[in-house]
Regions:
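Acidic/His-rich, divalent-metal-binding segments that scaffold phosphate/diphosphate chemistry
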Residues: 1-90, 94-97, 103, 110, ...
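Divalent metal-dependent phosphate-bond-processing catalytic cores, especially two-metal-ion Mg2+/Mn2+ enzymes
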Residues: 46, 95-107, 124-189
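A short structural micro-motif
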Residues: 114-116, 183
């Protein structure tokens, strides 16, 4: 169904690493807002599942990814929707619903680039949805620092709000980075 692309292997490897780190973060910083380890893992694994579908449907989507990853002002999905009739977040949410993923997971997939709602605080999204997004953003940042891959501007747009939501601060990141590096070393990744 999907064309063989070396980028997809790297994509799924990164998704798996971010999922592992997200689940570990729940254990490390504590369960809150009914978000369990397995919820964080599942969401982080599938949050970008719309990307391969967009790649298949729109031949120029690779270019869109490059533009969206480099945009410091607009939401990632806003860039996508300026070039295509939908975004990977909408496609991923629909795919998650068709797989009967929990509604909080589907909503988190739909809104995981919505930095305005993350910054807005309580009321914009359900607390569990916001927490799932925050966990995955912190995990993605840790993964990017560990691997030097998949750089984007999402941390600059959402990082501070995600740390606040998780009751962390930037000074906690080196310790989390060290713990995640140890975890991934033990996992053989």
């Amino acid at each position: 169904v999907l064309p063989p692309m070396p980028a997809l292997e790297r994509f799924w490897d990164a998704s798996a690493r971010v999922a592992q780190i997200s689940g570990w973060l729940v254990q490390e910083i504590g369960r809150k807002d009914s978000v369990r380890t397995e919820d964080a893992y599942t969401f982080s694994l599938f949050r970008d599942c719309g990307i391969p579908i967009m790649m298949r449907k729109f031949p120029q989507y690779i270019e869109t990814l490059a533009i969206a990853n480099a945009d410091t002002e607009r939401a990632f999905t806003e860039v996508e929707e300026s070039r295509h009739p939908t975004s990977h977040a909408v496609v991923g949410c629909l795919l998650g619903q068709s797989w009967w993923l929990p509604e909080n997971t589907c909503q988190a997939i739909r809104h995981h680039h919505d930095f305005v709602s993350i910054r807005a605080g309580a009321g914009a999204l359900q607390p569990a949805v916001r927490r799932l997004i925050a966990l995955s953003q912190v995990a993605e940042r840790i993964d990017q620092e560990m691997t030097g891959q998949n750089r984007s501007c999402e941390w600059e747009k959402m990082g501070e709000a995600c740390l606040d939501l998780l009751e962390l601060n930037i000074d906690d990141m080196p310790q989390l980075q060290a713990g995640a590096t140890e975890l991934m070393g033990k996992e053989g990744n």
